[in-house]
């Protein structure tokens, strides 16, 4: 086991302490967030000399839950003062590259993929990381039953419990720890790890603690299908096809870790019966009821059975397998090259690393490159070390933060101009200036002119990020007080619009990464089990509103560029937004919780098209819906359960971020009574802290039916709502 956890290089182990649970804890004053042109990596300074030479910054202290040392501010009496106090705090968190770093965690099945990849490739796990990952997982363990869900708010399940139990054991936790005894008991009550969803079984097979017969096939031969085939992977949702590519390579090789003492012990711990007595093939379709949120269609089960019982033993030719594996390997190489070994997600990243280990060997350049970039996915907070859903959300956060600062007058305020200028420089630097190489071969859409979620190095364009990035640039470049040394020229802004226009689907809506490639009927092939909507590129209200709003802003500055096409795209987008409205007035969101989030963006898009409460039935219905959800304390509070129920579910408490969203939606729509907005802003101001910030409440974002933390939302959305109130109604005392 010790060969997998790296050695301390100094006397740093003497700096360790024990937390309230008796677990080892690192010295938080030694953690540093390295920012290399937007690439973020947490580093632990083991030597006293390093620690003294590199004092901890305000952002680092804040992320770690330490005292920032910032002064207390007088309690704000007006919305403008509250907004400016918020900007003051937010500006202190900007990193040297001009961006804002943040946590983007939530799903609990992602970290195990990365740790297993580290383990099976014999890549040393930094000891400080191992300690803090253990702390984070124990902090996220559910007290009532000892398990973990598939995301942090979810009920315990086989996927969360099996995978996170394994991670804790790989990182040195004892099987006799009372918390692991409780988790093991729960897992056995589900039937053991053989009752976990297919993706969990896959990673357990890679680790060598389950037999491959237990896993439904991941046939690389799918990649030999012509693009004309409606089920070809090129038609799938981009995350599913990218993950499938490297997973299918590993599955086809039937590769497993050779094993060590820990994995031998896990073979006995993960199951209620002896490992040698398990008929793994009989459990290929076994699934705990608690994980079966999206039952597979009978045709999918039939296809899997025919593949296992007929195709593989009798029809699968060696030459076909070799051709398929070669095609998949070329796609893996292209993905690594185009994303600079960062990958689309931690899952595809981890699987690509293992595929490179199998194909190129342990000491290869590809494995080394993966080992260097994998750190960009980890995030430290006060509870320990987690794994972000991506390598960061730098562009997304920076775009929205700078809009909030500008709304509060920061662009014209000498105190904050350097902050805004640095943010502009970051956004200018991270616009994608070309398409990927071998675009058609690797099934990538046009990205030139767009912006990514994180950085240009990762390189995946996202519609919302392109829309908000474009709006931010336009807003800043029109501010005459700013001395912008490197303005983005018109042709690059035109490229951004070209990129957006390429993304619109036949419905008028927009997806996340690309135009829909396949039929909506691909949803019949859903295999997510615990999470749904994994096969199809769907239209999303938030993506559509971001594009429609960006095109509206662009037309103000460049009214003649592709005038008819821009107007047509806006009109069709607005029609989609209206058609997506529920009969009772709400819009169902996907990437933020939920009706409150989508409602804000939808009402803004309608307003930019001249449709407000006074002249638009959709706007009136949207406002009436939002006002009906205001709580007695003046705030709004919506549970993430709205994702799954597809109806507004109340949270037990009002939420600052959702209150800001609701207030913004009402103000965008020019709701005639400012009383609900004023009540909401009073709640926001009452929760503002003495440094100018707001505390973390419920996770704000969404993925599938689960939650994601967008930890900067609580810092800039309230500012934006307060500033918008001042712009519309004046700076009255509250």
UniProtKB/Swiss-Prot annotation:
Residues 1-26 are annotated as: Disordered. SUPFAM superfamilies: Terpenoid cyclases/Protein prenyltransferases. It is an enzyme of class 5 (isomerase). GO terms for biological process: ergosterol biosynthetic process; triterpenoid biosynthetic process. CDD domains: SQCY_1. The keyword Repeat applies. PFTB repeats lie at residues 130-172, 493-534, 570-610, 619-668. It holds the Pfam family SQHop_cyclase_N. The record marks 396, 453, 591 as: Transition state stabilizer. The keyword Repeat applies. GO terms for cellular component: lipid droplet. Residues 16-26 have a biased composition (Basic and acidic residues). Terpene cyclase/mutase; part of the gene cluster that mediates the biosynthesis of the meroterpenoids nectripenoids A and B, as well as cochliquninone D and isocochliquninone E. The pathway probably begins with the HR-PKS ntnH that catalyzes two chain-extension steps to form a reduced triketide, which then primes the SAT domain in the NR-PKS ntnG to initiate three more cycles of extension to give a linear hexaketide corresponding to the polyketide part of nectripenoids. NCBIfam families: squalene_cyclas. Belongs to the terpene cyclase/mutase family. This is Terpene cyclase/mutase ntnI. The lineage of its organism: Eukaryota, Fungi, Dikarya, Ascomycota, Pezizomycotina. The gene is ntnI.
